[in-house]
From Swiss-Prot:
GO terms for cellular component: membrane. Zn(2+) binds at H78, H237, D241. Pathway: Glycolipid biosynthesis; lipid IV(A) biosynthesis; lipid IV(A) from (3R)-3-hydroxytetradecanoyl-[acyl-carrier-protein] and UDP-N-acetyl-alpha-D-glucosamine: step 2/6. NCBIfam families: lpxC (TIGR00325). Belongs to the LpxC family. InterPro entries: Ribosomal_Su5_D2-typ_SF, UDP-acyl_GlcNac_deAcase, UDP-acyl_GlcNac_deAcase_C, UDP-acyl_N-AcGlcN_deAcase_N. Its EC number is 3.5.1.108. The gene is lpxC. The keyword Plastid does not apply. This is UDP-3-O-acyl-N-acetylglucosamine deacetylase. GO terms for biological process: lipid A biosynthetic process. Keywords: Hydrolase, Lipid A biosynthesis, Lipid biosynthesis, Lipid metabolism, Metal-binding, Zinc. One of its GO terms (molecular function) is metal ion binding. It comes from Burkholderia lata (strain ATCC 17760 / DSM 23089 / LMG 22485 / NCIMB 9086 / R18194 / 383). PANTHER family: UDP-3-O-ACYL-N-ACETYLGLUCOSAMINE DEACETYLASE 1, MITOCHONDRIAL-RELATED.
Amino acid sequence: MLKQRTIKSIVKTVGIGVHSGRKIELTLRPAAPGTGIVFSRVDLPTPVDIPAAATSIGDTRLASVLQKDGVRVSTVEHLMSACAGLGIDNLYVDVTAEEIPIMDGSAATFVFLIQSAGIEEQNAPKRFVKVKKTVEIRDGDKFARLDPYFGFKLKFSIDFRHPAVDKTGQELEVDFANTSYVREIARARTFGFAHEAEMLREMGLARGGSMENAIVLDEYRILNNDGLRYDDEFVKHKMLDAIGDLYVIGHPLLASYTAYKSGHGLNNALLRELLANEDAYEIVTFDDPQAAPKGFAFDMQTAFA
């Protein structure tokens, strides 16, 4: 059977919170089959566990924020994206603040951490959310849609109308049957505009944001000396975010995702719409790994890496 996966050993790192600017400790621990991805605020007098779930996402203005009984864990999308890309079903994530450290602004550090810990198959079938009917959410000209598809593919379009962004690809389609998440998506960094960063700092946010963890643009150009990691890094980062946002449903999706100018809020609304329509999806497993979609039937250390 196609099995669930966790990590083999405990791994730790330290990074900066993009909003608080504070040093944050992050520990990844193996978890039993059926656990899912569980975030734990270990800095509180009594640690609070918040399982990743579509219905636990609260605030989505600047990041995907998990909330439970007034306790928050913000900026979970890059780590969730790495877990999706590496096929991790079960994991404990201990964090010493209300946000996951931003690291370099991509999912690459989290991929490295998970691969350093090693990946272990577990004696339980991997469960997928198979989309059976089209589900769509619109907000003005923005939209996000899930269509039935035997595999996992995404098509994302952005429209930033900025000279530096216009020069790069604003639309990207990726099918993980024939694309490496680790090579093609994981290293794409978050991006922001210098004038917005100033506004956010005045609001007490983005105190940890810098060119060390984001692509920064002024009105005309990219300010980072080292330029871009991919020619189309902007749209690739939006896709990286979407993969993480969608993975909070708790299982990998068997679906085709299409989006135009979507963000954390629309992605979460799409998951909630799917879950509200019980005839639009089903949970499936694969007794024969070869019967699973290409990209998931892996012998290697990764899902669609």
